[in-house]
Structures are given as structure tokens and as C-alpha cells.
């Protein structure tokens, strides 16, 4: 996941305070501040501070400073980083060197005459290292470029905003950078059958979902059906656009980081993946999980190659899958031959993580 920080370095505290408040409102996780501002920033809200001060949440020193500062900070459980201004090849080599120290979590890079080439070199050089690369950016285009360099891009951007709108635009960019596109396939319905009652899970999120959005859920990790959010108007019950009536407690749901979780494991505050009919994703937050006994329905489908996959949902008109045209279709209206959208995964799962292993799911 890409992340972004804000630099609050205006001359006047009142201006810096507004930058911090804008960052809080835009869900920016951390701000780089002057050492004397740390306590004042903490009074404004729950946001991480970045500075040289050992009392910061993320302790960052400049190139040439004593690295034992970071070693000591790491022992105290702090995150650590080195700010490096890239002015010559030696600076790039220094960045590569300190990135291999196990007590350094971040390198924060500011390009001078050259910016893109040093970033490309370091992204390639440090591909397998346990380090996060952060690039300083002073406008949205520079931030976007940094996120996209060599397709992989930097892990994060330290952004210097011009005004409140700049902070919000940056937050929007981060959300877009984290919006992965998944490949969705279609499967043909072969059976729809009422199977009795069981414990069903509703996922109420902190997001308002739109038509075409839902979550990827299924009984098998290799085939997750797109279950539509409760956004469709009907004459009997009010819509719940924040909700996906997901399925029984045993079912998998796809979460951020390409990990699956059992529906029964979810709780308030957990991250969840919202997926639309075209496979575009965005991150959501679970606000509440409801588990209730409800009548259930087995849905069986066949996809290319003759593979049969199944899922179970509540037997009710308001539960919908998504058909081949991207439209929601109620599970009570499903019939043999209908096509619905799902995500096929050839990997097995171990504690929710994709692995190369043979597994049989029935």
C-alpha cells in the first residue's frame, strides 16, 4: 500500500496548525514538524509526528548525523528514517548503504538537480531490502510520478502542500494509487438451492458504496463471488449503502494486501476491500459486523474449464450478485444459465495469504 506524509514547515505556527488539521481531516497518517511543535500537534488529534526529536513517533535524522540516534530510537520501539538530499552519486550510494541497516525503516529522498534517475536506481537496487523509500514532492504531478516510477514506484511521498486544497488533492492521489484493478471473470450458474438456516454475517462499513460496488466473498478461496452492496432501491426496506450482506460465518472475504479472512473473524476497525463491477478497488473500514441466524441458499457455478465452484448466501431478495453486464441480480431471481462475476485465484491460502500449494475445496 502506498502512503503519504505531509510536511508542516510554514513560518507561522497558525499556518502550520492549519496544515496539521487539514492532514487530520484527510486521514494523512503522519506529519513532519519542527521539534518544538510536537506537543502542540498531539493536542490537535491522533496523528504521528516526524522529526529529529526522540519523542517523535518517527525519528528522522539528516545525512551526516549520528546514526546511533536511530539505533537507540529503534530499541525504544520507534520508527526511524534518514533524510537524504541527493546532490551527487555519493549521496545515492549512501542511501543504498543505510537502507541495509536493520534499525532504519525509511529513507526520505530529496532530489536536487536530478530526481527521477536516482529514484529509479534506488528502487531497483533495494527491491528485496526491508526498507521503505519516501520521496519529497512539492506538487501533485511530482508525487504521482514518484508513485509510478518503474511501475513499482516509491512506497511513500513526503508532500509539501501549498494550501488546504493541496492536502486534499494529495489524499485523493494516495487513494487512487492504492486502487488496484482486479481481473474479474464470469461463471455460469448451474444450481440454486435453499439449504436451511445458518449463521449469516453482515458487514457494515464506514463507507457509502455505490451501484456496482460490493465485496468478493466465497466458500472457496479460489473463487470469490462479487456480492453487491445493499444500494438497490426497493419498496419494502430502506437501502443500506454501507452494508454487504456477505454470507455465512465460514466464508472468505478478500481484504487489502490480497489476503482473505473468514467472515467470522472481522470486527470494527478492520480493513476491507470494496470492489466494483469493473474490478476497481478501494479500501474500506469495518464499522460493525452482525451475525444472525438466517435462511441460506447454495449457489453453484461453472467457469472456463468445467471447474465447479460454490458459495452460500442468505436466501432473501435484497442479497444480490453481479451479472455479466455489471448489473446487480437478486439471488432469488438467479436461474441456471445466468452468468455472474467472480474472481478466480489459482493459489491456495495459508492464514489468508496466497501460496503455491495443491489444495482441494469441495
Curated annotation (Swiss-Prot):
<keyword id="KW-0028">Amino-acid biosynthesis</keyword>
<dbReference type="GO" id="GO:0051287">
    <property type="term" value="F:NAD binding"/>
</dbReference>
<dbReference type="GO" id="GO:0102042">
    <property type="term" value="F:dehydroquinate synthase activity"/>
</dbReference>
<comment type="function">
    <text>Catalyzes the oxidative deamination and cyclization of 2-amino-3,7-dideoxy-D-threo-hept-6-ulosonic acid (ADH) to yield 3-dehydroquinate (DHQ), which is fed into the canonical shikimic pathway of aromatic amino acid biosynthesis.</text>
</comment>
<dbReference type="GO" id="GO:0003856">
    <property type="term" value="F:3-dehydroquinate synthase activity"/>
</dbReference>
<keyword id="KW-0057">Aromatic amino acid biosynthesis</keyword>
<keyword id="KW-0520">NAD</keyword>
<protein>
    <recommendedName>
        <fullName>3-dehydroquinate synthase</fullName>
        <ecNumber>1.4.1.24</ecNumber>
    </recommendedName>
</protein>
<keyword id="KW-0560">Oxidoreductase</keyword>
<dbReference type="Pfam" id="PF01959">
    <property type="entry name" value="DHQS"/>
</dbReference>
<dbReference type="InterPro" id="IPR002812">
    <property type="entry name" value="DHQ_synth"/>
</dbReference>
<comment type="similarity">
    <text>Belongs to the archaeal-type DHQ synthase family.</text>
</comment>
<dbReference type="GO" id="GO:0008652">
    <property type="term" value="P:amino acid biosynthetic process"/>
</dbReference>
<dbReference type="GO" id="GO:0009073">
    <property type="term" value="P:aromatic amino acid family biosynthetic process"/>
</dbReference>
Amino acid at each position: 500500500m502506498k502512503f503519504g506524509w505531509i510536511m508542516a514547515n510554514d513560518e507561522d505556527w497558525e499556518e502550520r496548525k492549519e496544515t496539521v488539521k487539514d492532514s487530520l481531516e484527510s486521514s494523512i497518517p503522519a506529519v513532519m514538524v519542527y521539534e518544538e511543535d510536537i506537543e502542540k500537534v498531539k493536542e490537535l488529534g491522533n496523528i504521528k509526528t516526524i522529526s529529529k526529536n526522540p519523542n517523535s513517533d518517527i525519528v528522522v535524522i539528516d545525512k551526516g548525523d549520528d546514526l546511533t540516534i536511530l539505533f537507540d530510537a529503534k530499541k525504544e520501539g520507534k520508527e526511524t528514517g534518514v533524510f537524504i538530499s541527493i546532490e551527487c552519486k555519493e549521496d545515492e550510494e549512501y542511501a543504498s548503504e543505510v537502507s541495509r541497516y536493520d534499525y532504519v525503516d525509511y529513507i526520505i529522498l530529496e532530489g536536487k538537480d536530478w530526481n527521477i534517475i536516482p529514484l529509479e536506481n534506488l528502487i531497483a537496487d533495494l527491491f528485496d531490502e526491508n526498507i521503505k523509500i519516501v520521496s519529497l514532492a512539492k506538487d501533485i504531478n511530482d508525487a504521482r510520478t514518484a508513485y509510478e516510477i518503474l511501475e513499482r514506484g516509491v512506497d511513500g511521498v513526503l508532500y509539501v502542500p501549498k494550501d488546504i486544497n493541496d492536502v486534499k488533492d494529495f489524499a485523493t492521489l494516495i487513494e487512487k494509487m492504492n486502487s488496484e484493478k482486479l481481473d474479474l471473470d464470469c461463471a455460469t450458474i448451474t444450481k440454486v438451492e435453499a439449504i436451511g438456516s445458518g449463521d449469516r454475517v453482515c458487514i457494515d462499513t464506514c463507507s457509502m458504496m455505490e451501484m456496482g460496488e460490493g465485496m468478493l466473498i466465497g466458500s472457496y478461496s479460489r473463487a470469490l463471488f462479487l456480492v453487491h452492496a445493499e444500494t438497490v432501491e426497493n419498496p419494502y426496506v430502506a437501502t443500506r449503502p454501507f452494508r454487504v450482506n456477505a454470507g455465512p460465518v465460514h466464508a472468505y472475504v478478500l481484504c487489502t494486501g490480497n489476503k482473505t479472512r473468514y467472515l467470522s473473524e472481522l470486527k470494527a476497525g478492520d480493513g476491507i476491500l470494496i470492489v466494483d463491477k469493473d474490478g476497481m478497488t478501494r479500501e474500506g473500514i469495518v464499522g460493525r459486523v452482525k451475525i444472525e441466524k438466517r435462511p441460506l441458499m447454495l449457489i453453484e457455478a461453472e467457469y472456463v474449464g468445467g471447474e465447479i465452484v460454490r458459495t452460500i448466501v442468505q436466501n432473501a431478495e435484497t442479497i444480490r450478485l453481479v451479472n455479466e453486464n455489471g448489473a446487480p441480480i437478486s439471488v432469488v431471481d438467479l436461474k441456471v444459465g445466468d452468468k455472474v462475476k467472480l474472481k478466480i485465484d489459482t493459489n491456495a491460502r495459508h492464514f489468508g495469504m496466497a501460496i503455491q500449494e495443491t489444495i482441494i475445496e469441495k
